[in-house]
């Protein structure tokens, strides 16, 4: 690991950039709600004005990546079509339609006569986001950061440098036109800077890595800055004996092929032994016609799956048109397999038996547990969050798709009238603890 990634000390140029973002984040944290919404609309406007430059930059990045032999999964994430760009721009505007996450009063309580406590949401400060390939993530992350009153330092994959630079330039122009400090959004383009970010604990309040398992684990182990993220997206779908066969086929197919490079696409399909023969008879040609390579355990190979799986396959995130299949004796074996290999991202079950579904959903300790629907629904936009800055598989909150609510923290505001603790110790004053 140390041979691949190193954590250098930040140079003066990076320190200067980080300080500018920190100062801009302080300004934005004090900005009224309507001004942050205004900024998002200007950011969207300037993305539209610069759309041809952005698409040209992406074409250049994509062509270069193809020549370098980058994997199909990364190429899929890198490609920014006109449709995807327009969707991203619309997403920036829609973030402005979401409820303001800042200054929300969570607790309002009279502690005693003349002593009042409030707990209110406040921006985190500066986000450091490291991600691979997907240039549309720049729009998502930046809009969520500004909406929640935060600054953001971005580091995308080098294969998308031209695209990311064009997008950030447009976003900064929009911020500036709206009257806010354009330095609230900063793009880093070198690997050295992305690693040196890990030593910016005086400037960055939260690191959000969106990349390979290896990268995420390295970041988690090599920074004093809190890290929000997930290392793997090994998602499972269990087809129960009491599953509706047509539903099972449809959901399994969507969960794999709708966007195989996504972290919420399934990597392993578990089949109850009594439904496996009928299911595979229809599923094998269906997956084959969609160019999905099926890899299975011995029992599934005996039922027509072409390639035999190894132990490594059960813990592999393919991010491609490859699917591992395992036949299990019952629900308990399916649960045992998932508990052993799941990355705690999203796992689902197809069954008409509500008792079976409830047991599965209550026992499986993943951020998302789904019944009779595609795992591809595990997404901030589809959850109604507007967009997501990432997905967290940690047990402590925020968990699952992280939208605006995950980009604020809270502070306690206590207002008194000369109150002192000694008066309560001596009995001169009493606590009322009355919620207001």
Swiss-Prot record:
CDD domains found in the cross-reference section: ALDH_F18-19_ProA-GPR
A Pfam family it matches: Aldedh
Example of a GO cellular component annotation carried by this entry: cytoplasm
Pathway: Amino-acid biosynthesis; L-proline biosynthesis; L-glutamate 5-semialdehyde from L-glutamate: step 2/2
Gene Ontology biological process terms, A to Z: L-proline biosynthetic process
Enzyme class: oxidoreductase
Keywords tagged on the record: Amino-acid biosynthesis, Cytoplasm, NADP, Oxidoreductase, Proline biosynthesis
Superkingdom classification of source: Bacteria
Primary location: cytoplasm
Protein location: Cytoplasm
The reaction(s) this protein catalyses: L-glutamate 5-semialdehyde + phosphate + NADP(+) = L-glutamyl 5-phosphate + NADPH + H(+)
Molecular functions (GO terms): glutamate-5-semialdehyde dehydrogenase activity; NADP binding
EC assignment: 1.2.1.41
Job description of the protein: Catalyzes the NADPH-dependent reduction of L-glutamate 5-phosphate into L-glutamate 5-semialdehyde and phosphate. The product spontaneously undergoes cyclization to form 1-pyrroline-5-carboxylate.
Family label: Belongs to the gamma-glutamyl phosphate reductase family.
Protein name, entry field: Gamma-glutamyl phosphate reductase
Organism ancestry: Bacteria, Bacillati, Cyanobacteriota, Cyanophyceae, Synechococcales
């Amino acid at each position: 690991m140390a041979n691949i990634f190193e954590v250098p000390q930040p140079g003066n140029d990076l320190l200067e950039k980080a300080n500018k973002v920190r100062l801009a984040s302080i300004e934005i944290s004090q900005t009224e709600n309507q001004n942050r919404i205004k900024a998002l609309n200007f950011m969207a406007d300037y993305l539209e004005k610069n759309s041809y430059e952005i698409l040209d930059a992406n074409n250049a990045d994509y062509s270069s990546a193809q020549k370098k032999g980058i994997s199909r999964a990364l190429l899929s994430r890198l490609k920014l079509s006109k449709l995807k760009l327009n969707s991203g721009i619309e997403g920036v505007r829609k973030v402005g339609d979401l409820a303001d996450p800042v200054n929300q009063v969570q607790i309002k309580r009279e502690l005693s006569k003349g002593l009042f406590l409030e707990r209110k949401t406040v921006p985190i400060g500066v986000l450091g986001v490291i991600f691979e390939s997907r240039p549309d993530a720049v729009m998502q992350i930046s809009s969520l950061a500004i909406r929640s009153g935060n600054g953001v330092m971005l580091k995308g994959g080098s294969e998308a440098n031209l695209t990311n630079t064009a997008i950030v330039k447009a976003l900064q122009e929009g911020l500036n036109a709206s009257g806010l400090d354009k330095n609230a959004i900063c793009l880093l383009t070198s690997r050295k800077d992305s690693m040196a970010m890990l030593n910016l604990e005086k400037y960055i309040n939260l690191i959000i890595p969106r990349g390979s398992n290896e990268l995420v684990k390295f970041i988690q182990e090599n920074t004093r800055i809190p890290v929000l993220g997930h290392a793997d997206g090994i998602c499972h779908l269990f087809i129960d004996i009491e599953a509706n066969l047509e539903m099972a086929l449809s959901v399994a197919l969507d969960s794999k092929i709708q966007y195989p490079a996504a972290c919420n696409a399934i990597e392993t399909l578990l089949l109850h032994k009594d439904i496996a023969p009928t299911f595979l008879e229809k599923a094998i040609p269906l997956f084959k016609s969609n160019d999905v390579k099926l890899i299975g355990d011995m029992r599934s190979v005996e039922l027509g799956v072409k390639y035999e799986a190894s132990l490594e396959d059960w813990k592999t995130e393919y991010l491609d048109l490859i699917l591992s299949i395992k036949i299990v004796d019952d629900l308990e074996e399916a649960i045992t397999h998932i508990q052993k290999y799941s990355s705690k991202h999203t796992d689902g079950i197809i069954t008409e038996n509500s008792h079976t579904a409830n047991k599965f959903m209550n026992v499986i300790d993943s951020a998302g547990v789904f019944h009779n629907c595609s795992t591809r629904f595990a997404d901030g936009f589809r959850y109604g969050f507007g967009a997501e800055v990432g997905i967290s598989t940690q047990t402590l909150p925020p968990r699952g798709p992280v939208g605006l609510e995950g980009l604020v923290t809270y502070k306690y505001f206590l207002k008194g009238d000369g109150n002192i603790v000694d008066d309560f110790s001596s009995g001169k004053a009493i606590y009322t603890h009355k919620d207001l």
